[in-house]
Structure formats: C-alpha cells, structure tokens
Amino acid sequence: MVLEVAIFDVTDADAFAAAYLGARDQLLSSDGCRSVRMTRGIETPKRFVLMVEWDSVQAHENNFRGTERFKAWRTAIGPFFAEPPRVEHFTDVD
C-alpha cells in the first residue's frame, strides 16, 4: 500500500471543498484506489491535505494520472489553486 499526500493552497476554500466533493468519485472509481480523505486546515483554512491510499505508485500513475478521470478532476478543482499542489508518495515504516 502507498499513501499519496497532496497539499493544496487555494483561493476560495468553500468553492474548492464543493468542487472536491463533486469530483471525488473520479479518484474512487480508479483501479487500485483504496480510500480517499480530504482534510482542511484549522490554522490555515485555505490549505487542504488530500490522502489517498493506492495499491502502488504505478496504480496512481497509470490508473488515474494518465486518464480522462484525472483531466476531469483537475478541471473541477484546478481553478481554485493558489499555487501548484505538492504531491508525494509514502510507505509505512513498520
């Protein structure tokens, strides 16, 4: 299992949250996607952290990033980016 973590700084937090909820199924319907969770900053309410569990980095890259679902996802949420998101993949230590 791989955890994708993406940090979004946005211009309109409420509009971004609504756009995310409308586009969330683009992620969930991807082969290899196990779970999706979006959190919103308390101290920085225009910052969001997305956590997606994937079977592998390849599942993320091949089954989502390289598809029309990714294009639809970015079309929905991209207009609210204050800057490009920061995205990394992580694995468990234990």
Regions found by a protein language model. Give the residues of each.
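Glycine-rich beta-strand-turn "strand-cap" elements at beta-sheet edges
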Residues: 2, 37-49, 72-94
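Short, well-ordered beta-strand segments in beta-rich or mixed alpha/beta enzyme
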Residues: 2-9, 37-65
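Short, surface-exposed ligand-recognition loops at beta-strand->loop->(often short) alpha-helix junctions
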Residues: 9-19
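Generic structural motif
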Residues: 11-13, 57, 92
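An amphipathic, aromatic/His-enriched active-site/gating alpha helix that lines ligand/cofactor pockets
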Residues: 18-33, 53-86
